[in-house]
Amino acid sequence: STHCISSAASDVYKRQGQFGEVHLIVEPYYEGMPVPDMYKFGGQEFKINVKGTEEVPLEWGGKLVFVNSIVGGSIDARFLPAILKGIMSRMEQGPLTGSYARDVRVIVYDGKMHPVDSNEISFMLAGRNAFSEAFKNAGPKILEPIYDVEVFVPSDKMGDVMGDLQGRRAMIMGMSSENGYEKLVAKVPLKEMSSYSTALSSLTGGRASFIMKFASYELVPSDVQDKLIKDFESKQTEE
């Protein structure tokens, strides 16, 4: 999933013998994106003074850009890897629907520590929780894999096959005739292609075939996103 706006959040992790407080900004990232000197959220201004930047390539694609903008040593630099670890764990688990988050910039701009009770676990959990809140408030959008699909079908079955594909949220890209068969070219979300082989065989009496290959990631329609989030939240509640 990816974002459309920037969002700020903070979290205090406090237990007996443990303390960590993290303030951060989460936003979508694209290559070469500059860091502004200041952000404004809810009437508050956040000045940014970049001390260091770490780019983390993600195993599932895209990257996390982690920016240290902590002023006046409010958090020791030794706790930054723990904050990063907490953010990464939440990106991998997926704060929205359990799917990976990618192409995100996180700016840690403030926080607090305790001379005795602060440790790595406190800052890992504070970073994770602050990221979750900011991510959800940033209006994240879910991406889904889209496949190029070519279907070879007898002309008398073309209407049925096309109707079925359109019911699978397909975008029909073109049609042509080849050796007495019609070739139908479409872009279809991978999610909608489950059991397609069986459905196509049933529609055409086994006289059609298809090939598919990955094309791109695209934003899911808002009604589909709402359903995915709702299903994920009810599953979390059950667990």
Predicted regions and their residues:
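Accessory interaction regions appended to the cores of large information-processing enzymes
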Residues: 6-239
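Short, exposed "boundary/linker" segments that immediately precede the start
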Residues: 1-2
